[in-house]
């Protein structure tokens, strides 16, 4: 544990940080939480806890902290500590809350003076039962430079059913309240009963943990990890495993806490991103094993805002790539040997129409929603049931058995705002309609032809036999044979040309290959290949929309190369150098005055917007997006938003290793 001090002048024009002390913990353990408070006018008190069931109390004397007491009682790792004054009086007793993996919260009283405080009546709580005998009320004495203090056990708070991650004090409406969050998917408020002095849970928010069937005992790491008060104390937020913030705001008129729209997002690397064919919404896939749909909430009198509106796929494998087949259908690939195709359900289509002004096609034949059977990975189409209807479970075949918690009522699909996490995790899956088999290893790339008729796929490979590209016809969902064989290592990216005449593939073998459509509409044959397209592996590729077929390749050799097909040959027309390995590249569909834009991203998170002229591809102008709004890690994919009119500014969606999906607006300042 290191103690630091800020050093600054009177006007704060220069600020420095000075190391005061390094505390070596004994016995050794990993400190997980610290709490610091003013003990008296001269001294500070520091509480340290972690991977041992004890709390160490350090008191400062002449800027140096010394171990003064060790508080025992917990039976598991301690995850949270927080100090507060009992009342608004600065001389009132100091209270310390400690929360542990033993499912309990303990309160400790720091009392100034040589006499002990009155024994807390909270220990007379009948809910404690047989625990009372095991509760020690031993007094610990600590001294500062000017005063003496006692530390006594004040209360034991029971109510959570799993590990507790947060304990946070707040003086609210003249009352002292404690906020706690737990692995049991709940957030609780605690308050001392004015009559008996017993600490009771006055409000509980969140979910019923049993519905999820996961606890810390089964290896789950779910629940609510963080709980925070708003500055005015009338709102609280919590963050959990799925990456969603949950927000509740207190309504004095209704005397209840109401859930509000909050921020959601991926929690691990985002590997793939694609727009719907009309650009109305965005799909992203991640190694957090989810595919998520983002769109703009459009309201009269309010600016449009981006939100997660559906979680089409919640999988058991890390997801690697995704592409849209139509406005209501997409295909995704994961760390498994097959690809899965999903169709939009009626519930999602109607919600997007209502909240995002996305015109829905005929929804009468669509299923209402989807759910996952207890022992399955595939989303099954289901019909929502009325609020009063009883549901029969599939008793004859346990593989078709449905978790009662996943039953979807019609009222659960009626939204007036973007869905909360509870709905995203259960009610807004998309039914899986097809599986595409053929590959022998994990899927690495997928691309859909511009007309939506062909899906091209590739998998991880270390030999020519496995580094093939497989094509599937979207009408019959059958593989178009033979597979395309040219690469010797993993194919990292696939792209169809704007007219579907060509298919471009690039790979870790440093090779790019152009395949040409043959007389049979679904067949492609090798037309051009360059086994040394880059000096290091090629990580991404893209076609431009110039009249002359022109494509881009991005390599680990820190360059983007511009190639053009002229008659029967491919010529290198230009090279754009970058400051790091280029991991993503994409070209705008908009061509103006013979010029177009393309964007590229690097493994350091840098994004460049380049302007290229069809007549001078060797002279490319590059503008770098400010580091302040750039991702912190590798750019995995960039996609330009389709369907933008001339009056609308162009936009790009960026998938990054830092778990973010970002949308940037690209404007031409010279216009």
Segments (PLM) and residue ranges:
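A short beta-strand motif characteristic of beta-propeller blades
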Residues: 20-24, 67-70, 154-156, 212-216, ...
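Conserved strand-to-loop turn within each blade of WD40 beta-propeller repeats
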Residues: 48-52, 98-104, 110, 181-186, ...
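Structural hallmark of WD40 beta-propellers
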Residues: 41-47, 88-97, 174-179, 188-189, ...
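WD40-repeat beta-propellers
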Residues: 1-6, 55-60, 81, 105-110, ...
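Repeat-solenoid scaffold signature
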Residues: 85-89, 161-181, 270-355
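Canonical WD40 repeat/beta-propeller blade segments in eukaryotic WD-repeat proteins
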Residues: 26-39, 76-88, 161-171, 212-231, ...
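Terminal intrinsically disordered, low-complexity extensions flanking WD-repeat/beta-propeller proteins
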Residues: 104-106, 111-158, 186, 198-223, ...
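Alpha-solenoid helical-repeat scaffolds
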Residues: 413-501, 506-508, 513-516
